[in-house]
Structures are given as C-alpha cells and as structure tokens.
Design a protein with these regions (language model features):
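A short acidic, Gly/Pro-enriched loop at the edge of an enzyme's catalytic core
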Residues: 1-3, 15
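A short glycine-rich, Lys/Arg-flanked "PGG" loop and its adjoining helix->strand segment in the class I
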Residues: 14-31
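Short, glycine-/aromatic-enriched active-site segment of Class I SAM-dependent methyltransferases
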Residues: 36-53
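Flexible, glycine-/basic-rich loop-and-beta segments that form/coincide
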Residues: 90-125
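Redox-cofactor binding/interface segments in oxidoreductases and associated redox assembly factors
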Residues: 6
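Short alpha-helix
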Residues: 57-71
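Conserved S-adenosyl-L-methionine
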Residues: 72-82
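Residue-level signal for inorganic ion chemistry
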Residues: 35, 88
C-alpha cells in the first residue's frame, strides 16, 4: 500500500512501524495515532491509565518520531486529536512520509512543544 493508517492499543508504535514499512510502497505515507498511555513507562501512567503530564506527552512524541526517523520516515505534521480517549487521555496524530531523497530535517520538523501546549490549553478545560 502507499498509505497506511495506524491506531493500535496496548503496544508501542515503535513495535509496529518497521513491519508496516516493510509492507509499504516506497515513498508511502502513514497517519498514526500516538497514545501516550501506551508509549510511556508504567511509572508515568496515572490512575485509569491516563497520562496527564504534558512533559510525558512531549517525551513520548519525541521518542516515536525519533524512532520513525531512524527507519527513514519524516514526521511532516503533528496535531492533537480533538477527541480524548475513553478515560480522558489526550492523543496525537502524526503524519509520516517515507523520507524521499533531498528532504532536509528542517522541512520535516514538527513543533512538539507547541502542539502539546495547544492540546492541553484546548482540552484541559
């Protein structure tokens, strides 16, 4: 496929991105839901599996996008989901593109801090 949508639970995206890439056409794209409750270590997940700390959100987004870059995906866009998870988790959508030749990191950077801040400013009301 040239496009894949990923929404997984109880497993890290870092465990599925490489197998998915191996099934894709070159220069394919992925839209993936980053769920902090399944990316953060158990010590960082609160009651009912909710991650409320913006610093943990930033940490897991950076971890997932760094891993994606390590397997030749460029994180081209990041946005928070306007819908919280069932227990109140804030989740994030990332658009990944199989890194084409000639694309620089500047062109693929996403502003994690701004997106996490906007998510909490909007949804923590």
């Amino acid at each position: 496929p040239s496009f894949v949508s990923i929404d997984v639970s109880f497993i890290s995206l870092t465990k599925v991105l490489l197998p998915v890439r191996n099934l894709m056409e070159e220069n394919g794209e992925i839209a993936a839901l980053i769920k902090p409750q399944f990316e953060a270590g158990r010590e960082k997940v609160g009651k009912k599996g909710v991650v409320r700390d913006p610093a943990v959100h930033k940490e897991v987004i950076e971890m997932v996008t760094a891993y994606a870059q390590s397997i030749s995906f460029a994180p081209c866009h990041l946005e928070f989901s306007p819908i919280k998870g069932p227990e109140g988790n804030i989740e994030y959508l990332v658009h990944l593109v199989w890194l084409p030749d000639g694309v620089t990191e500047e062109e693929t950077n996403v502003d994690v801090d701004a997106v996490v801040k906007s998510a909490h400013d909007t949804l923590d009301k």
